[in-house]
């Protein structure tokens, strides 16, 4: 039977590094910052709330006051308002992406 020879330069199981995968060593602080900035999360939450409140609110406000009980027109207005909120979110997201690209270009020019 073959036996394994212990090499002095090889680390034993107790001497191995504390790194497991991509986690930091025992003495280091881990980076707990979120991958997505807080302002992006807040914008998403605001538009999610708007996507729920604005169409439903516009339906119930207009069904009896403006359209005199005609729920078809009030429903159509609610659908239009949902699309308005969606388009507004896309525009805000595109503008935010463009400003990030401009900041990256300015950062490269300064170097």
Curated annotation (Swiss-Prot):
Record has Endoplasmic reticulum as a keyword: yes
PANTHER family in the record: VACUOLAR ATPASE ASSEMBLY INTEGRAL MEMBRANE PROTEIN VMA21 (PTHR31792:SF3)
Protein topology in the membrane: Multi-pass membrane protein
GO process annotations (BP): vacuolar proton-transporting V-type ATPase complex assembly
Motif (Prevents secretion from ER): 108-111
Residue ranges that the UniProt entry lists as topological domain Lumenal: 61-73
Major site of localization recorded for this protein: endoplasmic reticulum
Name of the coding gene: VMA21
Residues in compartment: Cytoplasmic: 1-39, 95-111
Membrane-spanning residues: 40-60, 74-94
Organism: Pyricularia oryzae (strain 70-15 / ATCC MYA-4617 / FGSC 8958)
Keyword presence, Magnesium: no
Subcellular locations according to the entry: Endoplasmic reticulum membrane; Endoplasmic reticulum-Golgi intermediate compartment membrane; Cytoplasmic vesicle, COPII-coated vesicle membrane
Family: Belongs to the VMA21 family.
An example Gene Ontology CC term for this record: endoplasmic reticulum-Golgi intermediate compartment membrane
Name this polypeptide is given: Vacuolar ATPase assembly integral membrane protein VMA21
Pfam family, any one: VMA21
Keyword line: Cytoplasmic vesicle, Endoplasmic reticulum, Membrane, Transmembrane, Transmembrane helix
Its biological purpose: Required for the assembly of the V0 complex of the vacuolar ATPase (V-ATPase) in the endoplasmic reticulum.
